[in-house]
Every structure is written in structure tokens, then in C-alpha cells.
Amino acid sequence: MTPWVPAVRRTVPHLPEVVLSALFVALFLVWSWLVLTGCTAAVDRIRPLFLPPRSYAGQIAEAFSLVTHPLVIVIAIAGVTVFSFRRRMRRLALALTVAAAGIPLQTILALTTHRARPHTAFADSISHFGGAYPASHVTAMTLGAWVLVTLTRAHRRPTSSVAQWVGVGVGAVALTAACQWIMGLAHLSDIVGGLLLGAAVANLALSAGGVDSILSAWARLGLPRESTDKRAAVIFNPAKFDDLSLLRRRVEAEVLAA
């Protein structure tokens, strides 16, 4: 009975992420059923004005679509994952691996549902590949924005800086969604599906890696590894803190940074 109690308590910090992940998965499944049964046909009939591919706006949209291509995003996330693992930030590497896995998962779902893309003048674009549901670029950019915000938080930035990067991430996702819709590469329902899938995988990644573990590991980045003569006095309640190794890493990071 004694070993079982700490195991239960260790899951408590991850509970919000697990709940949010389950919620977004449920919403994604419900929305997918509505889309694939044709219940969102009225929403999908809302179409943007025709955008000539060779116009200035068309070329800018296609260039942005290339930058936010899922292959580009997954390579970027994989690079940060390898960097994190080599720096022994294994919890962060685990979370990033789960996030990166969301992009091939989207590809599998798109091939499985095999939903036709809307008629578009950008049919020859490199972004026009695979099925339409869920929207590939939106899913990838949602995960990419999550990685950006997570790394910003983990790098111990001020609250105002974190808020700014959250705004940048949200803006990038919104711009990606608008670009995909304006180019006629995705229906509105496909975009909503991409957002829900990306949010579900992002919260699953957080629950797998653990917020506190990620923040503690990244906080030590760039700090001296050699021992110092600095000391710290810590007063804590053992009944409320079961992960002593995490406490030690956080205290070491604070001492080395002081």
C-alpha cells in the first residue's frame, strides 16, 4: 500500500493536461463524425473570393504556405528534440517527440478519411497533397506554436515575454488557417479539425513530459556544470513534495543562476 500512494500523487501535476487532452480528443472525434457524415456541408459552402495564383497576394500566400509546410515543422521539432536529448533534457525530448508524432498521425488520418480538397487554382502547389481532413498545415503549425511557447516558458522568460510569444504563436496559427482557406486548400471544417487534433496532441505531449520537469531541465541550460561554493537553505513540507529529485534540480538551477 505504501508504494502505491506516491505513484498516485505524482500524477496530480499532470492531471490538467490529461483532462485537456482527453477533452480535445473527444471534441476531435465528435467533429470528425460531423464532417465525415456531411453535417458541416453548410459551413464548407462558405468560400473565399478567387485568389489568382500569380498575383502578389497569391505568391505571398503560397510562399507562407511553403514555410509552414508540415515537413518543415516536423524537421524543426525533430532538431530541437535531438538537441534536448543530447543536453540530457529527456522529459522535454519526450514531450517534443510526442508533439512531432502528431504530424505523421495527421497524415495517416488524412489518408484514411481520404476527403477531397476543395476546387482550387493552387492545385499544383506543393501544399496541395493528401486528403483535406484534418488540415495538415493547421495541425503542424498548432504543434509548432506549442513548441515555441513551451520553450519560451521553459527558458524562464518574464511573464510579459511569454505573453508576447503566446500572441505570436496564436497569430501564426490564425494566419496559417486563413492562408489555407484563402488559397482554397482546405474547408473551414478541415481547419477546425486540424486545430482540435493539434491541441489534443500538444496537451498529450505536456502530460507525457511533465510541465515541472520540462521547466526545471531547461532552466539549467547554459549554467555552469562544475561545482561551486554556493549554498542554499531550503524549507519544505515533505507531505506536499514527493519528487525530491525535481526539487534538487530546481534548487541547483536557482543557485547556479544567482
For each predicted feature, which ranges?
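N-terminal transmembrane-helix/juxtamembrane module of multi-pass inner/ER membrane proteins
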Residues: M1-V72, T112-S125
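Alpha-helical transmembrane segments of integral membrane proteins
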Residues: P16-L23, R90-V98, Q164-V168, D190-G193
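Alpha-helical transmembrane spans of integral membrane proteins, capturing the lipid-embedded, hydrophobic core
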Residues: A22-V25, V74, L96-P104, V173, ...
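Aromatic-anchored segments of alpha-helical transmembrane domains
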Residues: F28-W31, A100-I108, G171-W181
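Membrane-interface loops
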Residues: I75-A76, F83-T159
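Membrane-embedded catalytic cores of phosphoryl/pyrophosphoryl-handling enzymes
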Residues: F122-G222
